[in-house]
Amino acid sequence: MDNSRRDFLRKVSMATAGMAIFTGLPSFNVIANTAKKPFFKISLAEWSLHRTLQSGAMTNMDFPSKAKNDFGINAVEYVDQYFKDKARDLNYLKELKSRTQDLDVRNVLIMVDTAGSLATTNDAERSKSIENHYQWIEAAKFLGCHSIRVNLRGIGTPEELASSSVDSLGRLSEYGQKNGIGVIVENHGGVSSNGKWLVDIMKQVNNPFCGTLPDFDNWCVSLQTTGTGKECENMYDKYLGTKEMMPYARGVSAKSRTFDAAGSEVNIDFMRLIKIVKAEKTRAFQGFIGIEYAGNVLSEDDGIRATKKLLERVAMNM
């Protein structure tokens, strides 16, 4: 083979290899987009607007459009008390579902606060409470939610409340499983804000449709009365509690109250918590972190915007 032909073949081979290398690489834009894509989507908890709702300035039916049009959020988390007599009102639910479909807004979950205690040691009361929750599982299914959020509150020792809670969650989760709806517990004061206690409940129930909803700031296990009112005397560590709850979490509630001049939450390290969420989440996690502004310094609208901006900033810097 002469030298000219040998050189030609060598150059063709090098060019082909180079093309193969570069063809296999994503473009710069793809790399940039992949690096910046957050692992979670933002939803809005209706409680963020509780003062507006309670004043009558808006209704539950208005909530999805406000989330989308005022805040650019296309996923919502309802609170049952703002449509508490509508769980089995098919016409109402059809209208709500139609509006969210027209808006391209996702119905994520329903927070249930008015259906009774699931941790009460009174068997008759507990059975009634369980039955009251069934309608919300059905409503959640109709709306396309992934879960209902429930509470574990009651009077008794931690052991007594645990026994009642396991019974309630076991029965509710079976019903939820039949309907494809999760039953998730929030740390919402009292013994439910003890992460270790709540995780033990999850282990005993042992149903994939029974899970948790870690809230960034609901960690007061017990209160004490002082001269100026009530103060928390036993505060569970929010970072430990979130880490403990995340393996069972189907969602996360990003509670916020007060912001500094830089836009960070004064008492809650969002970056640290969201790193925990990312590290400890499992396949149970449905992908949403819900804004729940509960402060009094900013207006509800401004508090929601500040929390959204903070979540977006954290996501971009992870």
Model-derived regions: residue spans:
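Acidic/histidine-rich catalytic cores of soluble enzymes
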Residues: A75-V76, G170-I276
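Hydrophobic residues within beta-strands of alpha/beta enzymes
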Residues: V76, V108-I110, I148, V252, ...
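Hydrophobic residues in well-ordered beta-strands that form the structural core
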Residues: L44, N107-L109, R149, V185, ...
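Active-site clefts of carbohydrate-active enzymes
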Residues: A254-A262, Q286-L298
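N-terminal pre-domain/capping segments
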Residues: D2-F142, E160-S163, Q177, K196, ...
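A short helix->loop->beta-strand "cap" motif at the edges of active sites that frequently abuts
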Residues: V105, I181, E280-G287
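Active-site groove signature of glycoside hydrolases
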Residues: A140-E160, N179, I184-V191, G290
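Active-site loop/turn elements of alpha/beta-hydrolase fold enzymes
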Residues: Y78-Q81, V112, V150-R153, H188, ...
